[in-house]
Amino acid sequence: MSKKRLYEIAKEVGVESKVIVAKAQELGLSVKSHSSSVEEADANRITSSLKAGTAKDESKPAPKATPTPKEEKVEPKVDKASVAKSAPAKETSKAEVKEASVALKKPKSRNFKAEREARAKAEAERRKNGGGRDNRNRNQQGNDQGKRHNNDRRNQKGNGQGDHNKGNRDNSTNHDRNFQGKLRNDQNQNNRRDNARNNQAGPRIDLKARAAALKAEQNAEYSRQSETRFREEKAAEQRRAKEQEKARKEKQQAEVAVQKAAAETKPAPKPAPVAPQSAPTAQVQDTRRKKVRPNKSRDNHRVNEDGPKQTRNNKWNNQNQVRNQRNSNWNKNKNKKGKNNRGNSAPKLVTERKFHELPKEFEYTEGMTVAEIAKRIKREPAEIVKKLFMMGVMATQNQSLDGDTIELLMVDYGIEATKKEEVDNADIERFFVDEDYLNKDAMVERAPVVTIMGHVDHGKTTLLDTLRNSRVATGEAGGITQHIGAYQIEEGGKKITFLDTPGHAAFTSMRARGASVTDITVLIVAADDGVMPQTIEAINHSKAAGVPIIVAINKIDKPDANPERVIGELAEHGVISTAWGGDSEFVEISAKFGQNIEELLETILLVAEVEELKADPTVRAIGTVIEARLDKGKGAVATLLVQQGTLNVQDPIVVGNTFGRVRAMTNDLGRRIKTAGPSAPVSITGLNEAPMAGDHFAVYEDEKAARAAGEERAKRALMKQRQQTHRVSLDNLFDTLKAGEMKTVNVIIKADVQGSVEALAASLLKIDVEGVRVNVVHSAVGAINESDITLAEASDAVVIGFNVRPTPQARQQAETDEVEIRLHSIIYKVIEEIEDAMKGMLDPEFEEKIIGEAVIRETFKVSKVGTIGGFMVTNGKITRDSSARVIRDGVVIFDGKLASLKHYKDDVKEVGNAQEGGLTIENYNDIKVDDVIEAYIMEEIKR
């Protein structure tokens, strides 16, 4: 019998796959997911049980008719509660009336302001009860008074009141009536109309009178409190005076008692009350009285006196006298400070220092200075410095303290210290981590983001080409996708966002970036090639990102296609099909002929439904940069993937280390749009610089905050780059010395997009040629310009253009300066070319090659020549230009060059195997019988 998948049964019955899986498990079938297979009989059982369940539900009566009596019972409870609540409300209102009546009692002390406001209130009541006639007369009088022009401010105020029908003051003192006539008649007519309207509307609430009464009550209460306070202070002062007087009297009595006791205890022989002593005291008093200067009589001739005193009495009639008084030396010494002029300056009052209580809590930040802490806790910096010194910390008032020291200091003061959590406005990552940023009630279903991964030329771009009905693959050089493309298609009313990642080994970072923002990975494997290195790498990226994998076995139309082999190879790497009991879906397709494409899309939507992908479109947009480039007309263009929120045109945005405002926004079809929701890929313009691919972006509340955050991020990135200094240590000393001996190939990289720049620079730095390394002097996005040529000339570098061309001026300058420009469109050709250039820069490397061995049979000593060794070749051959080693008992005794080589008496170039001959060695004569002569040459190694 044939088998059926559960999702096929769900499609036939018209229910969700989850319901079918639950029903199958309820019937005792061993199924795991919607893609599990069951027999035809089991499928019929599932459908019949579902139909029976729906029939039972229809046969049951509607259970929603019963709750009505419950609602009727609830109503009287609500009424009782409201009645119960109304009773205390009435009681409280009575209590409020009593309190108000107590508060309205006339104060004991007379408050003129309160009386005046009470009179205003009574006047307002009388005017309200009097009707329109008196009011009209008063308005008439106010108009007459209001139109009189006088310089008095009170008349100006009355004029304003008359214009607004509020002239209620008696301006009877004004008798000027210049402005009368038509204007006054019109105003009177308006007043009559207003009075008639007031009479029709009935009595109005006079808010001014009510405010005046309330103010009067407040003033009365304040005056009553002031009077009570004054009386209490006066009584306290009297008590203090009485206590002081009592203490003074007690002190005097105590002194008198002490004197009496002293007089009683002492005997009489003491000298008498000493008249001679009293006499000198009287003389001293007389002399002092004589020294007091007598009162001088007023000088009658002072009028004729000349000098500053005379001018002071005359109050200085002219300006010259004032200037002379200021510049004269008459009173110059009066303002001097010194021993003789102490009485001239009044004593300064010493203000007592106020005592401030310590706070109970102290919120600190890392790096606070001593002065800041002293200001916060209301203490002197010297006191804190002293405490720190006692704790063993030497600090000044301008020195910053770390968090631990601040906490210890606060413990010494008995204050609870807490570290202030500062929100970093420049931190974009907090939007992706903070769960409170999203509103869970506003979550909606979003489109899945699908990344297509696989090895080079396995059909990724062809699959996207088939999905979008476009010819993307024809534009790629060598059939290789150079940078990420983001596209969105619609299937069955639902949207799917696709990311196309490059498959070449150089684009590892770009594949990892694609896996980090994706929801589902479609791993495309060619049925004829099988699993390749980049296929394994894509599997690892997907597993690291924790996203489900759907395997698309492509090129099944080829005759040598073997899908079963692909399934087995993937199982070895942990990707197991659901048919084998795994979690990964396998779909056999042919991207070229469009075979089973619909089935692949349905599988993607099913997996997305199981994943329950949701987003909040109400918040400010956040997401990731897919790609960035520089356009000649538009400037920096960035391809963004919105992950949460909604991105709008004119939004202030921070992207990586740059910022700007969304000037224009286009979708994947090149059409201009104004908004982009979650999972939508868009290209925007308006940034200051081209960001890095993989950077996060976030929309801020205003442009000022976005500018501050962008500038702060750029500054931090620059500081981080400056701090990356490589210092020499014992561990890397040898590597540093070795790097100094290495030769370098300087290159300047210019590419069309940022992702290609990163991939190309990383690939060139990874080229492993011993003795030579690549130094990337500069890398950027855009065309090759004159500044690049100037930099290449200064640094002796090669300019590499990837999918870009030099400007005419740059080309002409390169020819003049003899700077080499290499233009490429396929990355592995660039790598091969640079690798060959690096190999050509190396010094020739030689390898030792042993060509023969000989054994010394006899030695001959010649006085002028030295020791001649007669030998026999045992292996290989001995040549005249070869080097020779003398080996004795397995140990190398000497290594040098042959001086001569003879066969019998003839000089020869070489002696072959099993032949005899004679030789001499340069600068060595200690040749002995049975020594082994090893001949070798140095050959150059090709790299």
UniProtKB/Swiss-Prot annotation:
Keyword Membrane recorded: no
Positions annotated to bind GTP: 454-461, 500-504, 554-557
Compositional bias per record (Low complexity), positions renumbered to this chain: 254-266, 313-332
Region (G5): 590-592
Region (G1): 454-461
Chain segments carrying region G2: 479-483
Pfam families to which the protein is assigned, alphabetical: EF-G_D2 (PF22042), GTP_EFTU (PF00009), IF-2 (PF11987), IF2_N (PF04760)
Source taxon at top rank: Bacteria
Its biological purpose: One of the essential components for the initiation of protein synthesis. Protects formylmethionyl-tRNA from spontaneous hydrolysis and promotes its binding to the 30S ribosomal subunits. Also involved in the hydrolysis of GTP during the formation of the 70S ribosomal complex.
The family this protein is said to belong to: Belongs to the TRAFAC class translation factor GTPase superfamily. Classic translation factor GTPase family. IF-2 subfamily.
Name by which UniProt lists this protein: Translation initiation factor IF-2
Native organism: Streptococcus thermophilus (strain ATCC BAA-491 / LMD-9)
Gene name tied to this protein: infB
